[in-house]
Amino acid sequence: EGSETVILTLSSPSNATLGSDNVHTFTILEPVGDRNISFADATSSGAESSSSKAIAINLSATSGQNVTVNYAVTGTATGSGTDYTLANGTATIPAGSTSTTITIGSIINDSLDEVDETVVITLSNPSNADAGSILVHTYTINDNDNAPVIDFNETSSSGAESVSSKPLTVDLSAASGQDVTVNYAVTGTATGSGTDYSLANGTLTISAGATSGTIDISSIIDDSIDETNETVIVTLSSPSNATLGSDSVHTYTITDNDNPPVIDF
């Protein structure tokens, strides 16, 4: 209940005159320490396909007055409708009640493969109650999207040795919310390290939000030697944040463009 009053009023004195201060009010204050406010739980989680989540706040005992508490919203997820909707605010438990909820609304079910994200709600500055033991609640939005598939957009190509470079396109089946990496190894009948071309073993990174990247065979040498066509074979392996597709090997053929020599006595 709220604070209560006892009012004493003097009247009808005998052998005296009633003064101006003839009323006294005594206030019985309700002890705030009789109840505290806190979250029902410190953590919870749900798939991003869940459109909303109600987070319970409990009061240990009823009050004759409204109990309010401020809350601030942080976490790795982005609010304002990007991942969810919930702004900083004030929660109210009406007089006579022992609970209320803060609702995380408009949780977005996107198509991006991404890490699980959090919404962290922190209570502060309660009125008509003391702060309880659980003042921070972390809600985890669990991603429900499969990792994209990564592979070459074609398994073979060719070009004359007069073509100085060749970009090989690596595709993702869908954009990802995370950077995607994939290792590649270079083999074939052509000789690297600047003899026929330049390309060493390495790692390709496709940035979050992008759907493709390129591996460049560069410094292709246009020599004057008549020779067989030569190959540069690039093999993808060990992707992170993606699944390796079936077209994981690309063979680029360097086509010789020199005439055979003339032989005579």
Give the positions of each predicted feature.
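Short boundary segments that mark the start of a structured unit
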Residues: E1-F265
